C-alpha cells in the first residue's frame, strides 16, 4: 500500500484565512414609493451599491421592477391581484415608481377552473390617452342558466366568438382614458363586472376578471408628469418662496438681541 501525504492532516497551510467582508457594508438603502392613486405610498426598501467613481447608485435603481400584492397597497382583503411597479426616477433617498403591470395569482386562477363549463379568453392591445400601449387579457366562464336542467353549460362556437368580440369591445372602450384612471378601474374589478353584465344577452358568464395587463410601450419620459403622479406637481415643496443663498455668496448675519 502506497503511503502518501494527507493534505487534510498537514499542519501548515499556505496563506492565512480569507477575510470575510459583509457585502451590505458597501450598500445603501432607498425607499420605494408607489404612485398617489394607491393608499399605501411607502411600500418597502431596496439596497443598491454605493456611488463609486463614475458609477452612480441611482443608475443601478432605475428600471428595477417590484411585484407586490394589491392588498398591501390598498389595505384590501382581496389578495389575488399582484401589481408590478417600475422605478423611473430617484429623488433624494426615494425611488419614484410607475405602474408596470398587473396579474392574478396562480392559486386564484386554478380555483376558477371547474368542470362542465366553457372557458372564454380574449386579449387586445390598446393605447391610452397619455401614450401607454397596454396588452389586456380577460378571462371568464360560462354559467348555468336558471331554467336549465342540464348538467353542463357549454357555449357553442358562435357564442364563444360573440363573447370574445364583446370582451374586446369593452376592454377597448374602458382603456380610452389615461393610465391613472385605467388603473383605478382595474383595482376594484369594474371592467370584469361590466363584461359580465353586457354578455348576459349572449350567454350568462361568471367569474369574469382581467387576468393580466402588460405595459408594451411607454411614452417619452417626463419628470414633471411623474412628480404629478406622485402628488408633487412640478416638484413644488413647502420651501417655495424662501431666499436661498448661492454658493460663495456672502450672507450678512442677523443682529443678536441678547448676549
Curated annotation (Swiss-Prot):
GO terms for molecular function: structural constituent of ribosome. The keyword Cytoplasm applies. The keyword Ribonucleoprotein applies. InterPro entries: Ribosomal_eS1, Ribosomal_eS1_CS, Ribosomal_eS1_euk. It is found in: Cytoplasm. It holds the Pfam family Ribosomal_S3Ae. Belongs to the eukaryotic ribosomal protein eS1 family. This is Small ribosomal subunit protein eS1. The lineage of its organism: Eukaryota, Choanoflagellata, Craspedida, Salpingoecidae, Monosiga.
